[in-house]
Each structure stands twice: as C-alpha cells, then as structure tokens.
Amino acid sequence: MQDRHHRCPDEAEIAAINARHLIDTPIRPADLLFVFGTREDVERRVDEACRLWREGCFRWAIVSGGVTPGSPLSECAVIKSAMVARGIPAEKILEEHRAMNTGENVIFSLPIIDAAIGLGNIGSVICLGNTWTARRYPMTLHRHWPEVEKMLVTIDSFKTPRALWHTDAEFSRRMIAEWDKIEPYKASGFIAEWPVGEARDR
C-alpha cells in the first residue's frame, strides 16, 4: 500500500501549506521559550535556543521530551545539557521528562511551569520545534493554554529552502504528514485554531 504522505501535492496544496502551515511570526522578547523535544536536529535546536537567549528573547525556558529510541536519556536531558553547555543558566531551564508526543509536551509541562513560575505570570511564549510540524506546536499550546501570546520559531537540516519543501522527497513526506493531521486533530479536540481568525480568512 502506498503511503498517502508520499503523494505529489498540487500547486493549490503547496500554496495552502506555505501560507497557512509554515507561519512566520514576528519574534519579540517573551516570558518563556517552549522547546519541543526531538532526537533529530538537536544541535540546530540548541543553536536557535542560544541565539534567542543571547538576543534577550526569553526569561525562562522549558524543555519537554521523554525517553525515546536513540538514547537512554530523555530528549529533555540531552537538549537541556547542550543548552547549559552553551551558556544558558541551568536554573532558567525547566524540565519535563515524560512526554512522548506534542500533546503530552504541553499537558505535562503546564503543571511544571505553574509550580515554578505560575501560569499567570507568563504572558507570551515562543514555540521552538521542527519546520514540518510548524503551526501544530502553537495550535497544541493554544488548545490547553489559550491566554498566552504565541510565537513560532522552526528549524530543520534540509538544504532545500523552506518554501521549496515540495521539491525534496523526504521534506515533502514530512510536511504532508503534518499537514494531514491538522483537520482531524482539530475535530478530535487535540489542537485549536491558531492564529485566531485564520479559519475566517480562508
């Protein structure tokens, strides 16, 4: 059976993904950087987190990610260790070590943030994760924490420019796989529309 995520998107779908999934947000200083864990492109994630820290873009960070194939250490432990080695103070980085998916990243992290800082003291969050997952990070956060302002920074190691993702077979497969999750996940209540008003603007 052919993987439906290997389909060749037409021009309309490419344009829709570029406009509605690969969202660019202005980045301004935020209260919290939310680092969504991974085993892939860890160094690039850490590079971006360190750049944001040096530029004064966040006061606190949380790294979320459990033990997944590839290491006996949690994704959180690996990423936080690298962030600290690059100069971000350990005491500024909260830890969540159980999450196995994006929903759990958020659900398991909120009580940790609340205990350490207080959710009411956070007004803005920068989401940091993979390019192909893109809008689903803030959509997941918006489902469980609608009150805060959300910004999005994404990274990847593909040599293909982001807007030309459809010209690289693996980049395209990942992008379409994530894009195909959006409507079913909204219908199931796993994520919420973000940016607010996006549905009206279609």
Model regions: which residues?
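A structured, mid-to-C-terminal "fold-capping" secondary-structure block
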Residues: 161-202
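A structural signal for short, hydrophobic/glycine-enriched beta-strand patches
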Residues: 1-175
